[in-house]
């Protein structure tokens, strides 16, 4: 049961990181569009204008944050895959191959499927 609690916590953290990643992506796209529109409309405006520096800084910070969130999601997905592999040593081959590649999928969608399948297997074992 400790493993299920670990996986539960890990999946909740992964979903939280995914939500932040999604918000960061939308913000990055929105600010990028604003930056481009301002850049196109003010062709004669000097580049030293504070709005350009502020938007440029925000774009850089959001880009770095997005990369960090991607790395965090990959690490947590890898941890979840390792925990699932420890629990399910006698899993059928097709499922094990899917689990191996799921750690590279965005948002760990296959990871969540694998987690729920393992949860069902452990629940039926407890009955």
Swiss-Prot record:
Primary localization class, coarse: membrane
Compartments, record wording: Cell membrane
Keywords: Cell membrane, Membrane, Transmembrane, Transmembrane helix
Membrane-related topology note: Multi-pass membrane protein
Membrane spanning stretches: 13-35, 57-75
Gene Ontology CC: plasma membrane
NCBIfam families named in the record: MPN070
The protein's name in its UniProt record: Uncharacterized protein MG055.2 homolog
Organism: Mycoplasma pneumoniae (strain ATCC 29342 / M129 / Subtype 1)
């Amino acid at each position: 049961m400790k493993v299920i609690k670990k996986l539960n916590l890990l999946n909740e953290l992964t979903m939280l990181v995914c939500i932040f990643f999604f918000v960061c992506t939308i913000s990055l796209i929105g600010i990028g569009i604003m930056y481009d529109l301002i850049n196109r409309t003010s062709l004669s405006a000097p580049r030293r204008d504070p709005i350009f520096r502020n938007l440029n800084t925000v774009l850089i910070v959001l880009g770095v944050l997005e990369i960090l969130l991607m790395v965090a999601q990959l690490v947590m997905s890898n941890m979840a895959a390792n925990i699932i592999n420890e629990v399910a040593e006698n899993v059928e081959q097709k499922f094990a191959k899917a689990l191996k590649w799921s750690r590279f999928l965005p948002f760990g969608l296959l990871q969540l499927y694998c987690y729920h399948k393992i949860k069902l297997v452990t629940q039926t074992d407890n009955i």
